[in-house]
């Protein structure tokens, strides 16, 4: 089963509303679809969605890398030897995790379709047939709009992730308190700071974090502030998750050794694909650190891969964020994600178990705009 072609398709995709987190405002998304075909006609799909919070890659650089590095390296090689193919890529690509993630996903999809089994089976087997997901309430300067969004999403999700860090600490905490007052004591709340606080900000916030009843504090401090975050973990009675500070398996090892978090977010794009994400999750679990699966708000292909990854993990400490296609105006798969009882089903079809809409890819191709 030789690889016959590797293509990159940049998309002009947009969100239903502006999504704000950290220092980023996103109304459009730089997705790139990677399509790999074999000489016997099997096709697999992957998706890159490079965002500046995690990588220097751009939509244009992903396309260039696929065309000038990935395709020449993979075409003519045996697709069934996935790990050796990833090792081949590691030799020709420098730090390009989102590009590698798309290729890794496409190879897994291709192999699953060829074998007639779901990707979760290729990752070792599925521990669950559905994955709990959480709502995501984007940051807004107006607390009333934050509350409105939280109440709307509370109708669907048990857990809500809120965002803070863009404003003065007390004003951000006032927004979180307003949400708590609106949704009531039974809603499960987590907050993502995206590394926007300094150590003094985090210390100031400790008492109010407890009073608001937040259960998870994600990436309170920026990468590089691990000694301070270790102290924060020791002082807080709730979980602290590492996200931006875990961009490799080695980073997961560092979290375990230094105890700078009690949970690791193993988003597959930032880590360089499902293979690396699975390894990071295994490292964390072996070291007594919890695991959650996040995303960078990808479309249907990467989200389907995330569901298979989450299904293949024995223990998930928190709900996953894997229904982000619902945030988009456009869809690229025939199947639409359905959230039922705060869960999303994992497809049991071959490969990713999705049908990619080639007409939609042609329509959204940024090169045709």
Model features per residue range: what roles?
Residues 1-40, 45-53, 325-330:
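Structured beta-strand/loop patches that form or line metal/cofactor-binding pockets in enzymes
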Residues 3, 34, 41, 70, ...:
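Conserved, mostly hydrophobic/aromatic
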Residues 37-114:
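Metal- or metallocofactor-binding catalytic centers and their adjacent structured scaffolds
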Residues 124-236:
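Metal-dependent enolase-superfamily TIM-barrel catalytic cores that perform enediolate-based chemistry
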Residues 207, 213, 224-239, 246-343:
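Shared catalytic-loop signature of beta/alpha-barrel
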Residues 327-369:
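C-terminal extensions of enzymes
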């Amino acid at each position: 089963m030789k690889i016959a072609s590797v293509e990159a398709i940049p998309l002009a995709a947009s969100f239903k509303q502006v999504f704000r987190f950290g220092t980023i405002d996103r109304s459009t998304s730089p997705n790139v679809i990677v399509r790999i075909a074999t000489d016997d006609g099997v096709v697999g799909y992957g998706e890159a969605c490079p965002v500046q919070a995690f990588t220097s890659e751009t939509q244009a650089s992903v396309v260039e890398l696929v065309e000038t590095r990935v395709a020449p390296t993979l075409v003519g090689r045996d697709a069934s030897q996935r790990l050796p193919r990833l090792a081949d890529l590691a030799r020709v690509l420098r730090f390009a995790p989102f590009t590698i993630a798309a290729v890794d996903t496409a190879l897994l999809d291709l192999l699953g379709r060829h074998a007639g089994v779901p990707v979760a089976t290729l990752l070792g087997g599925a521990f669950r047939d559905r994955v709990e997901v959480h709502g995501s309430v984007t940051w807004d300067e107006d607390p009333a709009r934050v509350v409105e969004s939280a109440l709307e999403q509370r109708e669907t999700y048990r857990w809500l992730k809120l965002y803070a860090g863009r404003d003065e600490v007390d004003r951000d905490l006032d927004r979180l308190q307003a949400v708590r007052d609106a949704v009531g004591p039974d809603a499960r709340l987590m907050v993502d700071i995206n590394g926007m606080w300094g150590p003094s900000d985090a210390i100031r916030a400790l008492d109010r974090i407890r009073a608001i009843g937040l259960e998870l504090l994600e990436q309170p401090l920026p990468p590089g502030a691990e000694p301070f975050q270790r102290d924060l973990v020791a002082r807080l009675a709730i979980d602290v998750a590492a996200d931006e500070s875990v961009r490799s398996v080695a980073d997961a090892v560092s979290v375990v050794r230094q105890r700078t978090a009690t949970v690791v977010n193993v988003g597959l794009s930032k880590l360089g694909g499902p293979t690396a994400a699975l390894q990071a999750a295994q490292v964390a679990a072996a070291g007594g650190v919890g695991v959650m699966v996040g995303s960078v708000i990808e479309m249907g292909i990467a989200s389907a891969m995330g569901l298979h990854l989450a299904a293949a993990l024995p223990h998930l400490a928190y709900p996953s964020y894997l229904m982000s296609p619902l945030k988009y105006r456009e869809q690229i798969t025939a199947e639409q994600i359905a959230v039922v009882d705060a869960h999303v089903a994992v497809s049991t079809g071959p490969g990713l178990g999705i049908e990619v809409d080639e007409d939609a890819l042609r329509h959204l191709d940024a090169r045709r705009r």
